[in-house]
Amino acid sequence: MVLDKKTIAMASGANYAAFTTLFKDGSPQTHIMWVDTDGEYLLINTEIHRAKYLNTTNDKRVNVMIWKHDDTFKFVEVRGKVVDEIQGEEAFENIQSLSNKYWNKPYPFPVQTERIVLKIEAEREFFFNLKDEDFDF
């Protein structure tokens, strides 16, 4: 499924996301995350020792809800699945880019294991109070 231009705009801006994965027993786990996009997929950067990553090795289904930083009643919910991963230098460069996007400075924390970017393919998108007029396309 091709991402809607509103979803691309939300993921490209400094808007936070609630990222939900599933434990082996099916119970959900949600974290507030930085989010990105390559125009085709949503991108979530984490480390390989984190539960959110380990959960996706067992169950690829995820949910990403991105809200506007200046109006939390405007958001998009994306239901999808992890279809690929980016590792190594490209994943490290992505966390630096995200840190600059959200904090205007380099990523300040040490990497404990290895950075990884989860590529998420959208299966459904739901919009709440988001209109094309909310963006400069």
Residue ranges and their predicted role:
Residues 25-27, 69-72, 111-112:
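A short beta-turn/loop motif at secondary-structure boundaries
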Residues 14-48, 56, 63-66, 77-78:
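Short beta-strand segments
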Residues 1-17, 137:
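Extreme N-terminal tail/first-helix region
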Residues 8-9, 34, 54, 107-110:
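Short secondary-structure boundary/capping segments
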Residues 48-51, 102:
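Short, solvent-exposed aromatic-acidic interface loops
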Residues 2, 74-137:
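Charged, gly/pro-rich active-site loop segments
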Residues 50-52, 71, 134-136:
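Short, surface-exposed beta-strand-loop junctions and turns on beta-sheet-rich folds
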